[in-house]
Curated annotation (Swiss-Prot):
This is Zinc finger protein GLI2. Residues 159-186, 374-440, 452-481, 544-578, 619-663 are annotated as: Disordered. It comes from the Eukaryota. GO terms for molecular function: DNA-binding transcription factor activity; DNA-binding transcription factor activity, RNA polymerase II-specific; promoter-specific chromatin binding; RNA polymerase II cis-regulatory region sequence-specific DNA binding; sequence-specific DNA binding; zinc ion binding. Pfam families: zf-C2H2, zf-C2H2_15. It is found in: Nucleus; Cytoplasm; Cell projection, Cilium. It comes from Gallus gallus (Chicken). The gene is GLI2.
Amino acid sequence: LMAGHPNYGDILMQSGGAAGTAHLHEYLSPVDVSRFSSPRVTPRLSRKRALSISPLSDASIDLQTMIRTSPNSLVAYINNSRSSSAASGSYGHLSAGTISPAFSFPHPINPVTYQQILTQQRGLSSAFGHTPPLIQPSPTFPPRQHMAVISVNPPPAQISSNSNCISDSSQSKQSSESAVSSTVNPVINKRTKVKTEVEGLPQYPQPRQEHLTDLKEDLDKDECKQEPEVIYETNCHWEGCTKEYDTQEQLVHHINNDHIHGEKKEFVCRWQDCTREQKPFKAQYMLVVHMRRHTGEKPHKCTFEGCSKAYSRLENLKTHLRSHTGEKPYVCEHEGCNKAFSNASDRAKHQNRTHSNEKPYVCKIPGCTKRYTDPSSLRKHVKTVHGPDAHVTKKQRNDVHPRPPPLKENGDNEASAKQSSKVSEESPEANSTTRSMEDCLQVKTIKTENSVMCQSSPGGQSSCSSEPSPLGSTNNNDSGVEMNMHGGGSLGDLTGWMTRLPVVDSTVSSGNLTVSLQLRKHMTTMQRLEQLKKEKLKTVKDSCSWVNPAPQGRNTKLPPISGNGSILENSGGSSRTLPNPRIMELSVNEVTMLNQINERRDSTTSTISSAYTVSRRSSGISPYFSSRRSSEASQLGHRPNNTSSADSYDPISTGGREFDIKL
């Protein structure tokens, strides 16, 4: 519409008085215009753009409103910047109070010049058929601070509809902010509307603060999970005690001195309504820590400045301190994952959730099928759903149901528990075997454990065989020496031959050399002995290499079998001396027993049993006074390669009839 008209600046400079032209030229010259921070240097550098307003009919176009709201109005050209009017919210027309200091006139306009400018504006109004906005002189007082508001350009229809809606509060507010009020009411309304919209913008710092609060809660959720609710108890509720105190410290001192340290033998909590139900603790310090649940004592306080956290358990304080130091000692054990955590519970939770779908922690409450990836979630579930009284301890877990797949750190404990259960299952067999042997032997002192410890002999070979002995499958297992040890050396392996044993046994404790001998009066006949000799003599060559510590060849001579039934004679017949000093601990009665054994070798009714009554010993007691696996007398060497006691010997068998003990 106005594209064909010449610029306002050209018209003002061509038609006007000398004074007015001089003053206008001062403001419109390129030198003065360069004072403003506008991208356009002179008015001639850019042509006036055609107005682009929302689609309206020609009859309804209000040129005055269009010019006032247009950013390309005359005043905008004089200021040479559309941003100045837009930033101040004046939408193209000048309001002296809204002009920022950067875009104000360099010096105030005197009244004479102001009247000349008004005259020029009236001449322009006759040419265009409307009255342009009046130019207000700039204020003489120092310019106020520039108010930053968001530029909003609503359509003109909205401006006209809101032009008459001005409240008293908004007018008073604008009058206090602006030194020179605007001549147009929609201007004040628009400024108020812009400020209202600015104030009504969504507040972003609030969600940010909530997010920080969530992070803080996540940081402290694990360190407080085992801490009970805040309790401050000053009265003693111990069983039979009703003392009252003023402070918590006095109550704690009373409990520790009078109740806990007073009962040194058993560590039981006798507090009223305690969910532990007087189950004893293993140590005193555990009871001291437990009592903090009742008293509310939290002696472990955070040492960082400004932090008032306190905990009843030292472990929880250490975990909390990592939130200050940033320490994360628990690294994910999965290959390729370098994530670290401040506590083990978070690491277990991460590993089970991220690297596997395993939920090994099962709720033990009957009827509940909940499973969790970490122990802290299970404890929280039990406490919140089933109540604090439903807490399941480690000891109770073994009694109710088989435990879930254990953690890695508990694997060794589980294995040891299983092994001990196996030993307990084998012990009844050993007990039954011992009962079946009561007609053959009587034991005075038993200090041995269920399993016999296998120790190495001086030759480097074990004195207890870990291989299955073929003696268990023979028909005549009447030896008093052969003892097959499987792994742990259970006594149940002796069942095959001890029930038919016509010998006198000796029991040797692991710490003491105690020999208790009771000879059986009723022995088997010589015929049975001769039969055993014939059956066992065939393999004795391969099992006699242990007589001397030095290795011997296969041409070792067998001891001769005498006609009187004694098979314990050595071919040399020379007496041997016991080099072990622990043999000095034998009592006089035991020496007498040994003499009786030597006398029974001449008897035709004696058996081979008496020769080995003191020889069944572990090599840990004496390497020279140990049991023979395949003796020359019993000759139970069905194994060609017997690995038992290859470097030890029996002083009874090697000494022959003239067995001497040098004291």
